[in-house]
């Protein structure tokens, strides 16, 4: 164990000793000057929990509509409905895309999200899932964030539980963890418009977990949040997971600035630095140690090279191939990569690549 010689933060000592970190500890670590030491401790804990393996899933990202009533300032993807590039896919079109994912790309997971469409009933989502499952029963359908579920419930005048039950009966396997953004109310009110509150997101997720629907969890960082908001957000996720055991991984999502209202209005003028990004990954690992085992590095937003570095700062998962990812593409990010490229990126840093399923069961190792 590291000896406290006055240069090592007490919170790092606690982390090395396996103690659960507090809010105060997290804030201290978000301000820790020695980034290398912070990363080294996070990497040590990552190794204790996950060994040398870095996982990823073969995932096809499918956006069923870009029409959204929310118009969040952080988003470059949404359309109001009268634009030339506004679209809504039919269940049949979605099933056809699922065929491409399975037959041509070897995807084991469909990651399906979209905008808050004001005219789609619950039957649309049920039919979408059934259309996929009738043709490809073995693919995992990970669809509709807690924010979308909450919106659908409000729109269709159903309870959140009823919406979740009907979608599960239609074949829904899991939920993506988007829509969490940042939980701090004041910050959330600036970067989010027309979306559920933090409490509503957490309660929707809790209900999903109670019904046996697992999910990942996320946090959007690198906009106007403060270090203490990052810590508080992560700790709320930690507390929920202690109750439900429903999160498969935590995915810190780096904010992509281009083409957003936050950029146009000058609220955010530049993206976060690599140093800040690595700090968030490392602190996430330390705060969630022994609670949520997996920390995913979302290379689509972070970039492949920085993602490799983040795997030495507490990350143990690269999320997935992200075939046909549209939301970050709208914000100027290059999306989509092959299984071979991901394995090569992992091997370059002397780690062991492994393909997983949605629920973190390893299904293929690469020598």
Model-derived features: where do they sit?
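Auxiliary Fe-S-binding modules of radical SAM enzymes
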Residues: 1-36, 96, 102-103, 235, ...
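Conserved, mostly hydrophobic/aromatic
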Residues: 18, 42, 72, 112, ...
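Conserved short loop/turn motifs at secondary-structure junctions
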Residues: 26-30, 60-62, 114-118, 221-224, ...
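N-terminal pre-triad scaffold of radical SAM enzymes
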Residues: 37-82, 86-113
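A structural signal for short coil/turn segments at secondary-structure junctions
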Residues: 49, 105, 136, 212, ...
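Mobile, glycine- and charge-enriched loop segments
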Residues: 54, 58, 68, 75-78, ...
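Hydrophobic faces of well-ordered beta-strands that scaffold small-molecule active sites
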Residues: 54-60, 108-110, 141-145, 175-177, ...
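Conserved Radical SAM active-site core
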Residues: 79-232, 236
């Amino acid at each position: 164990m590291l000896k406290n010689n006055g240069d090592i933060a007490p919170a790092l000592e606690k982390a090395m000793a396996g103690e659960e970190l507090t809010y105060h500890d997290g804030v201290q670590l978000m301000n820790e000057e020695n980034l290398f030491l912070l990363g080294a401790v996070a990497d040590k804990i990552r190794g204790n929990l996950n060994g040398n393996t870095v996982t990823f899933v073969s995932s096809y990202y499918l956006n069923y509509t870009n029409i959204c009533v929310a118009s969040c300032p952080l988003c470059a993807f949404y359309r109001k409905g009268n634009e030339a590039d506004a679209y809504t896919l039919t269940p049949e079109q979605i099933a056809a895309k699922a065929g491409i994912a399975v037959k041509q790309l070897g995807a084991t997971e469909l990651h399906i999200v979209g905008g808050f469409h004001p005219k789609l009933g619950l039957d649309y989502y049920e039919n979408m899932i059934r259309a996929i499952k009738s043709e490809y029963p073995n693919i995992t359908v990970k669809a509709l964030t807690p924010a979308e579920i909450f919106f659908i419930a409000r729109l269709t005048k159903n309870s959140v539980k009823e919406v979740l039950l009907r979608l599960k009966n239609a074949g829904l396997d899991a939920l993506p963890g988007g829509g969490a953004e940042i939980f701090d109310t004041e910050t959330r009110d600036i970067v989010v418009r027309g979306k559920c509150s933090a409490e509503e997101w957490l309660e929707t997720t809790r209900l999903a977990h109670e019904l046996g629907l697992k999910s990942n969890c996320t946090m959007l960082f690198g906009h106007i949040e403060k270090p203490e908001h990052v810590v508080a957000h992560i700790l709320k996720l930690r507390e929920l997971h202690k109750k439900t055991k429903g999160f498969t991984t935590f995915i810190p999502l780096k904010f992509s600035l281009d083409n957003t209202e936050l950029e146009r209005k000058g609220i955010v003028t530049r993206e976060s630095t690599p140093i800040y990004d690595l700090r968030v990954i490392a602190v996430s690992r330390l705060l969630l140690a022994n609670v949520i085992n997996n920390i995913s590095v979302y290379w689509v937003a972070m970039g492949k090279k920085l993602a490799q570095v983040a795997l030495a700062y507490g990350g143990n998962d690269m999320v997935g191939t992200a075939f046909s990812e549209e939301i970050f593409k709208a914000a100027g990010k290059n999306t989509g990569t092959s299984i071979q490229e991901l394995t090569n990126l992992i091997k370059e840093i002397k780690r062991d690549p492994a393909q997983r399923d949605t629920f973190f069961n390893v299904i293929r190792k690469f020598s």
